[in-house]
Amino acid sequence: MKKKICVITRHAIVNYGSFLQTYATQEIFNRYGYDTTILDYVRYDEEYRNVTELLLKKSNKWNKNFLTRLIYRIVQWPDHYICGRAFEKKRNKYLNLSERITDINKEKSKIPNADIYCTGSDQVWGEIGGDDIDPAYFLDFVANKKAKKVAFSASFGKSNYSEDRICKFSDLLKNYDYIT
């Protein structure tokens, strides 16, 4: 029987790089004989339906008054929505996705059972959207003590972090069995 591997990555970002790295990661594990599932964990701030409003809130230029906000929505929303839908269709067609999870702490029952849990690949460990790091990408949700925790080509996205942040990363990385 094939070993099961569950991969968490930032697969729902609306760009080709995100989609292609997820697909490549899935396929490499499949070729090595694993039954691969991509954990369909999509944070609220990475859901394409929410991008226009989230970017608007952060914009000093467009968030001045009702009229500028309306113009921004009229111009940006169709692009975000149409591109988001197109990428969603590709993800659903080519990726073996788990059930959708938007809050990993509240929806643990949706996390697939696996022999191996994997973070990667690409920039999954750094801050997301200016926020703090997301512990889910360090596999903090894995309850199965027998399961291996691995990182496959995972990165932070930048190299300059405060000493406090480096200590936090160091503690989180100790939970892994293997890091490539």
Where would I find each of the regions flagged by the language model?
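Extreme N-terminal starter segment of soluble prokaryotic enzymes
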Residues: 2-6
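Aromatic- and Gly/Pro-rich donor/ligand-binding loops
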Residues: 8-16, 20-21, 25-171
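A short beta-strand/loop micro-motif in the catalytic core of glycosyltransferases
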Residues: 177-180
